[in-house]
Amino acid sequence: MLEQVRIQKMVNGGYGLAHLSNGKVVLVEGAYPGEEVLIKTYREKRDFSFGKVVSLLKESEDRIKPPCRYFGRCGGCHWMDVKYETQLRYKKEVLIDLFERSNLKVEVEDVEPSDLVFHYRTKMEFHFQGRKLGLKKRNSDFVIDIKDCEVAPEGTGEILNTVKEAVQVLNVPVYNWETRKGVLKHLVIRYAFSTDQFMVIFVTKTESFPWGRDLVRAVLKRFPKIHSIIHVMNSKDSVVLRGPYKTLYGEGVIVEEFDWERFQIPPTAFFQSNYSITSKLIDHVYREQALQGNEVVLDLYAGIGTFSVRTSFSAARVISVESSRVAVKAGKANANINSRKNIEYVEQDVLDFLKNYSGRADRIILDPPRSGAGPEVMKEIARLSPERIVYVSCDPSTLVRDLKVLVENGYSIVRVKPFDMFPQTYHVETAVTLVKGDR
């Protein structure tokens, strides 16, 4: 069904919201507030539909020509065709809308902009498919073959094309996502901005990878400054960087440095995707704890210690809880590198840890995955009754869900500060500060 609609506002997920002639809500991808578009609805839900733009009838003044030749086909970026300042405004408006619909009365601050709006990513995951090497279409497993990427670090395109050529020359069997046969699945590129270190990661289904040595030679011949080359063995299709790994070349880690600390980042550990925003976020989380020097701090979903290290300079003790063995090992190493003796790492599921923890928790930091912490974790946090909580989230919808539990258990939201971790996309990082009792 074709219908002309006017986009009223942006909503979570990067969609433009409009109403059909029958009053039903329709979410339109690739359309912005004030635009009039001819759409075709393609998926029906009980309360709303999804629509695709067939024709743009009235264009927003905020539209620009995207610099990427793959934009609109590749699913990596969503808002590259609107001005950067407009992207920031949309992200703030989406957050305000979500908080209002959840009956959480807060003031959302302006989104902290990224120093780099292109070539800012610290990690890119590319996928092999037949003779293609690239990024997937949005909501699809179809891979768009690309030669460069506007958000990947400078130099990524050259590495990408060198690997693709070498894979074809060496006749490396590429993994087939339908038959689940073949070997080579992904190419991951990690980059440390402060030290100019590249890590190239080959992800395979199998442990055996006899082509690895020749691929290393091909990459190093053109890029002798590559810091590390890694082979990750991952038989699962759901997550890219998971499973045992071995170092084919180099040290096996890259190092990122900030004002007060430096971090070793291993191949499969999580680390934030934007260097400049991560630096600002570390500062923010540290300040928002208002530490006096005698506090015990729980850092939940601690990763490699991104927030733990800075916090440990002003807290009596930091207990860093993380379920990933690789991240825990790196976190302990990072505590040593930064001469922090008051950080204790616990390798355990966060909920299991909280259920059995009865010690002090004067402050709690949490930075859960996109799925959020969940109501059970939030109830356990409330039970421990910390004076201040700083919740860092990469998904606004799971954030407001979790915050409601804390508010219902006697906490007040005193600050909502968004950070633009992902320019050119609808994603937004948000740090929320809560205090026990009334603000």
Swiss-Prot record:
Extract the CDD domains matched here. Answer: AdoMet_MTases (cd02440)
Q: Which Gene3D superfamilies does the record associate with it?
A: 2.40.50.1070, Nucleic acid-binding proteins, Vaccinia Virus protein VP39
What PROSITE patterns does the annotation carry? Answer: SAM_MT_RNA_M5U, TRAM, TRMA_1, TRMA_2
- EC? 2.1.1.-
Q: Where is the active site?
A: C394
Pfam family, any one: tRNA_U5-meth_tr
**Regions that span the bilayer:** none
Task: Respond yes or no to whether keyword ATP-binding is given for this record.
Answer: no
Please provide the Gene Ontology terms (biological process) for this protein.
rRNA base methylation
Residues binding [4Fe-4S] cluster are: C68, C74, C77, C149
Q: Which residues bind S-adenosyl-L-methionine?
A: Q272, Y301, E322, D367
| Keyword entries, A-Z | 4Fe-4S, Iron, Iron-sulfur, Metal-binding, Methyltransferase, S-adenosyl-L-methionine, Transferase
Record-annotated TRAM domain positions: 1-55
- Highest taxon above the source species: Bacteria
Which Gene Ontology MF annotations are present?
4 iron, 4 sulfur cluster binding; metal ion binding; rRNA (uridine-C5-)-methyltransferase activity
Q: Which family is this sequence assigned to?
A: Belongs to the class I-like SAM-binding methyltransferase superfamily. RNA M5U methyltransferase family.
Extract the PANTHER family matched here: RNA M5U METHYLTRANSFERASE, TRNA (URACIL(54)-C(5))-METHYLTRANSFERASE
Tell me the protein's name.
Uncharacterized RNA methyltransferase TM_1094
The organism is Thermotoga maritima (strain ATCC 43589 / DSM 3109 / JCM 10099 / NBRC 100826 / MSB8)
The major lineage groups are: Bacteria, Thermotogati, Thermotogota, Thermotogae, Thermotogales
